[in-house]
């Protein structure tokens, strides 16, 4: 669980920015969006395959550029 400890000299805006960065890094918001609606296992598999294909094509393009 992300948390930020403030000192007396810390600015609130800086602390808020650090907290947002920790939340983003931990993946809480993306997990929340993913779980907001039920997704059938078949749809999850399709998305996973599509993401893998996209990564592979990106890697192939990068290799061909060299």
Swiss-Prot record:
| Keyword list, A-Z | Ribonucleoprotein, Ribosomal protein
Q: Which GO terms describe its biological process?
A: translation
Q: Does the keyword Ribosomal protein apply?
A: yes
Q: Which Gene3D superfamilies match?
A: Ribosomal protein S8 (1.20.5.1150)
Gene Ontology terms, MF aspect: structural constituent of ribosome
InterPro entries found in the cross-reference section? Ribosomal_bS21 (IPR001911), Ribosomal_bS21_CS (IPR018278), Ribosomal_bS21_sf (IPR038380)
GO CC annotations, alphabetized? ribonucleoprotein complex; ribosome
Similarity section? Belongs to the bacterial ribosomal protein bS21 family.
Q: Which PANTHER family match?
A: MITOCHONDRIAL 28S RIBOSOMAL PROTEIN S21, SMALL RIBOSOMAL SUBUNIT PROTEIN BS21
Enumerate the NCBIfam families for this protein.
S21p (TIGR00030)
Protein name per its UniProtKB record: Small ribosomal subunit protein bS21
């Amino acid at each position: 669980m992300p948390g930020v400890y403030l000192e007396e000299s810390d600015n609130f805006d800086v602390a808020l920015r650090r907290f947002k960065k920790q939340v983003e890094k931990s993946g809480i918001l993306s997990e929340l969006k993913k779980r907001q609606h039920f997704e059938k296992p078949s749809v999850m598999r399709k998305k996973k395959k599509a993401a893998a294909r996209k990564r592979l094509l990106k890697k192939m393009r990068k290799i061909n550029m060299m």
